[in-house]
């Protein structure tokens, strides 16, 4: 008797999955498109903010390069 209840429960789950899978897939695709649009907007905003911040703050690339190359030379010695 337990086997028949288990079979019935599995059959109900299987049928439910078959019925609702296309709806869930369509919703997931629509959500993915909306998420991609939102991510693109967020990325564009982040780039614009980074460029604005870079203009406002002058980065001493020469000093950074000297620091990094000096560290690499010390590691190579050691």
Curated annotation (Swiss-Prot):
The answer to keyword Signal applying to this record is: yes
Q: Which residues carry this modification: Lysine amide?
A: 77
Name the residues of the propeptide: 27-56
The record's subcellular locations are:
Secreted
Q: Which domain of life does this protein belong to?
A: Eukaryota
- Tell me the GO molecular function terms: toxin activity
Regarding tissue, the record states: Expressed by the venom gland.
What GO cellular component entries does it have? extracellular region
Keyword terms: Amidation, Antimicrobial, Secreted, Signal, Toxin
- What InterPro entries does the database record attribute to this sequence? Pilosulin
Note the Pfam families from the entry. Pilosulin (PF17499)
Q: Where is the signal peptide?
A: 1-26
Q: Which family does it belong to?
A: Belongs to the formicidae venom precursor-01 superfamily.
Per the entry, what this protein does is: Peptide with toxicity towards insects that may also act as antimicrobial peptide. Causes calcium influx in F11 cells (EC(50)=5.8 nM), possibly by modulating sodium channels (Nav). In vivo, is lethal to insects, but does not show toxicity to vertebrates. Intraplantar injection into mice does not induce spontaneous nocifensive behaviors up to a dose of 200 pmol.
The name on file for this protein is Myrmicitoxin-Ta2a
Per the UniProt entry, what species is this protein from, by scientific name?
A: Tetramorium africanum (Fierce ant)
